[in-house]
């Protein structure tokens, strides 16, 4: 469950290391974002010469959460850290060209096939 002020790791090579959620998109009073949801983030920590810099505001899709996701068979997939992949604001395509760490199958249903294909492991 990601809400406003939550900090996440950037799971791509866009240049961001830590980002903070400033808005959960998809509804006027929506409080929480789960895996596959789009949020608005600001870059809090970035590496030098990256594609994004500290202070940039852009969209991101949540790919891993501590809360996890429940599957229809009753199993729950949980992760150690909250992580997201930064997206271009207009096209909603990934800013980076590589994805680090596993992602879940739920992203495939949410029309993020580009992220699923770039990921090293799909759970």
Swiss-Prot record:
Keyword check for Ligase: no
CDD domains xref list: Ribosomal_uL14
InterPro entries per record: Ribosomal_uL14 (IPR000218), Ribosomal_uL14_bac-type (IPR005745), Ribosomal_uL14_CS (IPR019972), Ribosomal_uL14_sf (IPR036853)
GO cellular component: cytosolic large ribosomal subunit
Positions in coiled-coil regions: none
GO molecular function: large ribosomal subunit rRNA binding; structural constituent of ribosome
GO biological process, one term: translation
UniProt KW keywords: Ribonucleoprotein, Ribosomal protein, RNA-binding, rRNA-binding
PROSITE patterns named among the record's database cross-references: RIBOSOMAL_L14
Assembly notes: Part of the 50S ribosomal subunit. Forms a cluster with proteins L3 and L19. In the 70S ribosome, L14 and L19 interact and together make contacts with the 16S rRNA in bridges B5 and B8.
Annotated HAMAP family: Ribosomal_uL14
Function: Binds to 23S rRNA. Forms part of two intersubunit bridges in the 70S ribosome.
Family: Belongs to the universal ribosomal protein uL14 family.
Protein's UniProt name: Large ribosomal subunit protein uL14
Organism: Aliivibrio fischeri (strain ATCC 700601 / ES114)
This protein's encoding gene: rplN
């Amino acid at each position: 469950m990601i809400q406003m002020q939550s900090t996440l790791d950037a799971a791509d090579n866009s240049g961001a290391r830590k980002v903070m959620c400033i808005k959960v998109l998809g509804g006027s009073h929506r409080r929480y974002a789960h895996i596959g949801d789009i949020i608005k983030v600001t870059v809090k920590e970035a590496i030098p010469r990256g594609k994004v810099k500290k202070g940039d505001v852009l969209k991101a899709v949540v790919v891993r959460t501590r809360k996890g996701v429940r599957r229809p068979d009753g199993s729950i997939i949980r992760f150690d850290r909250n992580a997201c992949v930064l997206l271009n604001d207009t096209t909603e395509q990934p800013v980076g060209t590589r994805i680090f760490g596993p992602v879940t199958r739920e992203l495939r249903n949410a029309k993020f096939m580009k992220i699923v294909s770039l990921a090293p492991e799909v759970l």
